[in-house]
Curated annotation (Swiss-Prot):
<comment type="function">
    <text>Catalyzes the synthesis of alpha-ribazole-5'-phosphate from nicotinate mononucleotide (NAMN) and 5,6-dimethylbenzimidazole (DMB).</text>
</comment>
<dbReference type="InterPro" id="IPR003200">
    <property type="entry name" value="Nict_dMeBzImd_PRibTrfase"/>
</dbReference>
<comment type="pathway">
    <text>Nucleoside biosynthesis; alpha-ribazole biosynthesis; alpha-ribazole from 5,6-dimethylbenzimidazole: step 1/2.</text>
</comment>
<dbReference type="InterPro" id="IPR017846">
    <property type="entry name" value="Nict_dMeBzImd_PRibTrfase_bact"/>
</dbReference>
<keyword id="KW-0808">Transferase</keyword>
<dbReference type="InterPro" id="IPR023195">
    <property type="entry name" value="Nict_dMeBzImd_PRibTrfase_N"/>
</dbReference>
<feature type="active site" description="Proton acceptor">
    <location>
        <position position="323"/>
    </location>
</feature>
<dbReference type="Pfam" id="PF02277">
    <property type="entry name" value="DBI_PRT"/>
</dbReference>
<keyword id="KW-0169">Cobalamin biosynthesis</keyword>
<comment type="similarity">
    <text>Belongs to the CobT family.</text>
</comment>
<keyword id="KW-0328">Glycosyltransferase</keyword>
<protein>
    <recommendedName>
        <fullName>Nicotinate-nucleotide--dimethylbenzimidazole phosphoribosyltransferase</fullName>
        <ecNumber>2.4.2.21</ecNumber>
    </recommendedName>
</protein>
<dbReference type="InterPro" id="IPR036087">
    <property type="entry name" value="Nict_dMeBzImd_PRibTrfase_sf"/>
</dbReference>
<dbReference type="GO" id="GO:0008939">
    <property type="term" value="F:nicotinate-nucleotide-dimethylbenzimidazole phosphoribosyltransferase activity"/>
</dbReference>
<dbReference type="GO" id="GO:0009236">
    <property type="term" value="P:cobalamin biosynthetic process"/>
</dbReference>
Length: 357
């Protein structure tokens, strides 16, 4: 029997400090630029202040990109434009600096950490720090079999928690969370459809490397078949992840929840992270207060998940590539919001703040 009790997260996760947020709002009202004139940057600064329990808000100085990687056997059905089992090649390209997330991370001077959970490649071909948390090689074909055994699901969830603890202990003050997977959006679509009670066609998108109509129909059919297997286990989130999630998505869910426990804010990237966040919300309803939706990728599953969590993405650029690239685009906005909240001068007490002519 599993010793992991997900119900504990309900008690362990607190909301960002509401009193501090009110103090941040009061400070904002005294600044020389009228409240509301900075749009969502005002909200971002106040959210970050509450997450840090600090007024004025501290600058984000140690952000990090964390990418969980895995291959999904469902890709053998032709649901992805990439060959099944090829996520390891993407990981190597990320590490060598040739993927969009690598370019953006260099531009923004943000380190990138890749965590192999279930790549279908020899772990000896990867750096030890990448492969150290691997649970298995590849994942089960979710339309006909479980993605993970119960033991593997617990190990993956605990690995995600451990990575969150490692980041918090190392001083990371904000995480951009993403995935590197082939077939991952099919698993994500299944989770979203199951948790939102909707049909497969509503959540089936084209993926990071767009697929044609025939592949879309195969993907929709795979999600439909996986949904039949997911619905009986909706009451047990760890079993749901074992049934149709996979090691990378299970680890991301554990990472998100433990980051909320450790009070480390997380920027969500695309549909895969949104699906994991939706599972996390089912586990602990306060957890999403620690997460920020970076962008609208145009993937219908992401839109459905964010709507269910009442999260509004910061950007709409149609970035579907995944791998944390869209999440990184939102990081400068968060950093700008923190700088504005902390550095704009305040007026003297009682002095009215007015718009410039």
């Amino acid at each position: 029997m599993s010793s992991l009790n997900l119900d504990d997260f309900t008690d362990l996760i607190e909301r960002p400090d509401g009193g501090v947020r009110r103090d941040a709002e009061a400070r904002r009202e005294r600044q020389v630029v009228p409240p509301g004139s900075l749009g969502r940057l005002d909200d971002l600064g106040e959210w970050l202040s509450a997450a840090q329990s600090a007024v004025p808000v501290r600058p984000v100085v140690r952000p990090r990109v964390v990418l969980f990687a895995g291959d999904h056997k469902v890709a053998e059905l032709g649901v992805s434009a990439r060959p099944a089992g090829s996520a390891g090649e993407l990981v190597r390209e990320v590490l060598e600096g040739g993927r969009p997330v690598s370019v953006l991370a260099r531009r923004l001077d943000v380190p990138v950490r890749v965590v192999d959970m279930a790549l279908d490649c020899d772990p000896e071909t990867l750096p030890a720090e990448v492969a150290g948390h691997r649970v298995r090689r590849g994942g089960g074909r979710i339309d006909i079999e479980d993605a993970l055994t119960p033991e593997e699901a617990e190990a993956a969830f605990r690995a995600g928690m451990a990575v969150a603890d490692e980041e918090a202990d190392s001083g990371t003050d904000l995480v951009v969370l993403g995935d590197v997977s082939v077939g991952g959006t099919t698993a994500a679509g299944t989770l979203v459809a199951a948790l939102c009670g909707t049909d497969a066609s509503v959540v089936t998108g084209r993926g990071g490397l767009p697929i044609d109509d025939l592949a879309w129909m195969r993907k929709c059919a795979a999600i439909r078949d996986a949904l039949r297997r997911a619905r009986p286990v909706l009451g047990d989130q760890l079993q749901l992840l074992a049934t149709v999630g996979g090691a990378d998505l299970t680890a991301m869910t554990g990472f998100l929840l433990q980051s909320a426990v450790r009070k480390v804010p997380v920027i969500l990237d695309g549909v895969v992270t949104a699906a994991c966040a939706l599972v996390g919300q089912r586990v602990a309803f306060r957890a999403p207060d620690w997460w920020l939706a970076a962008h609208d990728s145009g993937e219908p599953g992401q839109a459905k998940a964010l709507d269910r969590m009442a999260m509004e993405p910061l950007l709409t650029q149609g970035v579907k590539v995944g791998e944390g690239a869209g999440g990184l685009l939102a990081l400068p906005l968060v950093q700008a919001a923190a700088s504005l909240a902390a550095e704009l001068p305040t007026t003297a007490d009682g002095e009215a703040v007015t718009d410039g002519e």
